[in-house]
Amino acid sequence: MIHAYNKSYLSAAQKNLARMLDYLVNDLHYPLETAWQWFVTSELSARFEQGDCSVLVGLSGVELARAVLEQAGEVVPMQKPSYAYDRSPEYWTGWALAYYQWLTSLRFAEIKQAVSITKVRLLYTPYHEMDVRQFADKMNELYRAAKPETNLKAMRTLAGLSQSELAGQADVPVRTIQQYEQRQKDINKAQAETLLRLARALNCNVEDLMEKVPPLNFK
């Protein structure tokens, strides 16, 4: 699995996203859903998930929160953050989501579309007491339940093509397309030439066809 960025930045990234959510929700009293929506739709979110060091480690969590507010067109308060002895559920939510995004390389918007921030927050008990990898396994399960079809099928449907039409345009056997869509074959292990042909026919990037979350039933 290809991770979003170098692991050496992960710990700082987790702490900063955690502090950002904690500050916005518990110090500034914004709803969790609103705070997360502001972040996900901001330019900072894209830079974060791509491993931009100036965002991952160049800003503190509070500075990140203030930058998100500024991009959302909100008043940016100078209120000092509180530092509770116990980490809040919102802090854990940001911390865990940063790990999951790094692990899968999914965009935060993709995660949000499949699993709402409220649902992630509800995983605080019992997952905050477990290894974060167990949280990631649960997120994979929720993601796949919300998005059972492959990216190839989703892109083909979006393009309005049948399997046979895609096979003809991409010069790829229809049986191969069926096997990828049914997860009988792992598209991540497909030959580069096959992926390029499919991507050209679907007018998308090769990355758009790759599966970043392991299927629940793939052997």
Feature map (PLM): residue ranges:
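A short, Lys/Arg-rich alpha-helix, primarily the initiator
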Residues: 137-160
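Short, basic-rich loop-to-helix N-cap that marks the start of a DNA-contacting helix
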Residues: 57, 185-197
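DNA major-groove recognition helix of helix-turn-helix/homeodomain DNA-binding modules
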Residues: 65-72, 192-208
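C-terminal alpha-helical interaction appendages
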Residues: 1-103, 130, 135-141
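Recognition helix of helix-turn-helix/homeodomain-like DNA-binding domains
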Residues: 53, 172-188
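Conserved hydrophobic/aromatic packing and binding residues within compact polymer-binding modules
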Residues: 152, 163-167, 177-180, 209
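Short coil turns linking two alpha-helices in DNA-binding domains
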Residues: 162, 173-176, 191, 205
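Short, charged recognition helix plus adjacent turn
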Residues: 210-219
